[in-house]
């Protein structure tokens, strides 16, 4: 069903025709669809008040709009004065006035929510289209808001966003008000923008914060489990990326990267002999496939390997010494990045955990396996490289937060990858 012509026009006139805050970006809300979805939403409510069931809901939205600079948006491009006039008419006028105001507040709310949620260029690489945040849907946003215990609280606390976002926004407001810490203002604004790409809603997902070297597993919108991780060293950084964990490999081989075979493995062979390879479970292979042929290690010119003149493929057999541990979780990407178990548990006790070649080593891989594989049927076996497909892929976000909420306050972590200054330079300056 469609809105009556006058209400449809009100919605269309109330939502700015141009991009309200980011001149270079297209609107995240398709305006014809917005009009139709808002009309359908109010038809379903059969005349029941939404915004005007409580005065606090309208004031919560107006306050957000007035402070839209905290979202790096321009408040002057939202029709705040028009909304206040419509709200006044709704409270003292006819049922028609209230319907007009309900439609207008809904349209601006959907527009603002979409503007806030639109991702900024913070360097996240999406290796799976399914992991990319979807534009805000008017129908879904309004229905979720309508089921909240308090619409005012839903709006005020920006519950359509990941919890990191409103927490960083509030902290940013406090710093701007104090006016004495420009460094922290820049830090909070940058990490606020990094939070825009995080999942919204209640689906399961994995969030790795490389700056803090921690992993959180979210279920039903809350952290269900957390663990330490080891991430890439400064020269081989864990990238900011998002993908979908689609399968796990039990009893994996570790395919030694060619540069490590040259810089670490070959010198050990030259110093200790071929017994080093046997002792550590390494074998030279023809290729990386599961049907690869094992090549006698004595046939390799290890001096040439160490000198970088010969490239050799080496894998480590499954077992207690294997660098991958007992399981690795795969989200297909061209960078060769994944989550995996590790036998090197002592590293998790260190405060700074940047020791990997880019992949994410897990403190408790068994716990993550239970969380994401759940009831997936598996056969107990010691066979190498058992692939187990997930019945439902799980989004994974490798993020980089040098400021984030924890225990009711904003904590900071060292910028171990020296990304903050570079990333901040690509973003617009937060308005004050």
What are these regions, as identified by a protein language model?
Residues 19-20:
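Membrane-interface motif at the C-terminal end of an N-terminal transmembrane signal
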Residues 25-33, 103, 107-111, 130-136, ...:
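Well-ordered beta-sheet/strand-loop patches within structured domains
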Residues 23-129:
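Cationic-aromatic interfacial patches
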Residues 1-6:
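Positively charged n-region of N-terminal signal peptides that target proteins for export
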Residues 8-16:
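Bacterial N-terminal signal peptides
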